[in-house]
Regions:
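Periplasmic solute-binding protein
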Residues: 117-121, 142-179, 184-187, 205-235, ...
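Extracytoplasmic ligand-binding clamshell segments of periplasmic binding protein
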Residues: 207, 229-307
């Protein structure tokens, strides 16, 4: 429901900001009146004084940017958006929904959790306007992740690209290396760098209870490039077994890099050092030219030290992880969030409608650090080269986008046996044994 009282929050790391201002768009105009600056929000008027609660896992700097992105909307419509970001998001959301006190809106980082809430009957289907906006401004690949059992529930929100390889343009220029456009070229480049006495790759997969997740991304990326999107989709749905020969072949292909002592682990040690290196530190030896390449998502940009120039002519940049089989197209592995509603109050509908438009996405782009796959957005507003590269790939009509597979699987596998299995694999356990163990963990 739309909250009009004081919402008590306990046991959370939370950011709560009410963004509706009593003064509206100007000193002489009450909230909800259309002035020159408020004309773009005319379609969302009629809800003055309403409060809409929004719950998310997004905290810190990005949370501040999101709240700033809809300030003008709140000023002009009189709708207060109470933002709460939590580091214990999934557990708390399940508890709140179970207790009958869900937030009005939730930003879901995992389609699997979204689907669970929809199947419980807790989520409301998306409004007609949100569905229209999504059909117009996002690809069908993106819409399908907000759709559960044929019914559309949640519009795409923000996005990131996982199919990136970080490198040093300065090192490449000084050594005469060129960015590879195919997998074979990338392997040939790796051999050339290894022959020079430098380990071409560096990696780290340690991440507390989530240790191992970076290898799941490697496997997913390679599977898309070898077996294709159709097999990938069936694998996620367990219509293709975890120990299927195609999955084994993809993981062995990953091993040609991550388990190759000639290739890894630049700046850290041998193959097994990968499991003892934090994912945040995994690519840092590139800065000292102790390794040349690091496969990691676009969000790794935030891990580089202050003062590092991230650009094609800078200290650090990224290139698209190249294809293996040209018949499989141009696959992109990525992730993102989806905005779902637990309330069908009109003010909630107004907020979800606005947050599914290019106009809102453009306001986020102006603040920097957040990317969207919205095809109607103005990418010239993006603040950094890596954001522009990411958005360009996400909105490329020739790209086949697929969501992070582990986020789509049952939690017992996707955030459990899959992570653990990849860690065991890095530490020397054979591919068949690892994949068979994960397969046996899939819930009935």
């Amino acid at each position: 429901m739309v909250s009009r009282g004081i919402y008590r929050r306990m046991g959370l790391v939370a950011l709560v900001v009410g963004l509706g201002l009593a003064g509206g768009c100007g000193d002489s105009e009450p909230a909800g009146r259309v002035g020159d600056e408020c004309t773009p929000f005319a379609a969302y008027l009629g809800h003055e004084g309403a409060k809409v609660t929004l719950y998310t896992s997004i905290t810190d700097v990005l949370a501040d940017k999101l709240q700033r992105s809809w300030e003008k909307f709140s000023e002009c419509t009189g709708i207060t958006i109470d933002y709460e970001g939590s580091t214990d998001f999934e557990k708390q959301l399940v508890e709140r929904v179970g207790a009958g006190r869900p937030p009005d809106l939730t930003v879901f980082p995992q389609p699997g959790l979204l689907a669970s809430m929809a199947r419980k009957g807790a989520l409301k289907p998306a409004t007609e306007q949100v569905a229209t906006n999504t059909d117009k401004w996002w690809s069908a690949d993106w819409k399908r992740y907000g759709t559960v059992d044929g019914k559309f529930y949640a519009a795409p929100f923000t996005a990131n690209v996982k199919s990136f390889v970080w490198y040093s343009p300065k090192l490449f220029t000084s050594k005469g290396y060129t960015v590879p456009s195919s997998w074979d070229e990338m392997i040939a480049l790796s051999d050339k760098i290894a022959a020079s006495g430098v380990k071409p790759w560096c990696a780290g997969i340690m991440s507390g209870e989530a240790t191992g997740w970076p290898v799941t991304d490697w496997l997913e990326d390679v599977l898309l490039r070898t077996a294709g999107a159709e097999v990938y989709d069936k694998w996620i749905a367990h219509e293709v077994a975890f120990d299927d020969p195609r999955i084994r072949a993809a993981l062995d292909r990953v091993g040609e890099i991550l388990k190759n002592p000639k290739y890894v682990n630049g700046g850290f040690g041998d193959v097994r050092s990968i499991a003892k290196t934090g994912f945040q530190e995994g690519g840092q030896p590139i800065l000292d030219h102790k390794c040349a390449m690091h496969r990691q998502a676009s969000f790794y940009a935030s891990q580089w030290p202050n003062g590092v120039k991230i650009a094609e002519d800078g200290d650090i940049y990224a290139f698209y992880l190249p294809p293996i089989d040209s018949t499989k197209g141009k696959p992109i592995l990525g992730a993102g969030e989806f905005l779902g509603a637990f309330s069908d109050e009109p003010a909630v509908g107004a907020v979800t409608a606005y947050l599914s438009t290019p106009e809102w996405v453009n306001s986020v782009f102006r603040l920097g650090g957040i990317v969207s796959a919205n095809t109607g957005s103005d990418k010239t507003l993006l603040q950094t080269p890596i954001d522009r590269l990411s958005a360009g790939l996400l909105t490329d009509p020739d790209v086949t986008f697929r969501f992070d597979g582990s986020d789509m699987m049952p939690p017992a596998v996707g955030v459990g046996s899959f992570w653990r299995g990849m860690t065991e694999w890095i530490n020397g356990k054979p591919t068949p044994a690892v994949l068979s163990k994960i397969e046996s963990s899939w819930p009935d």
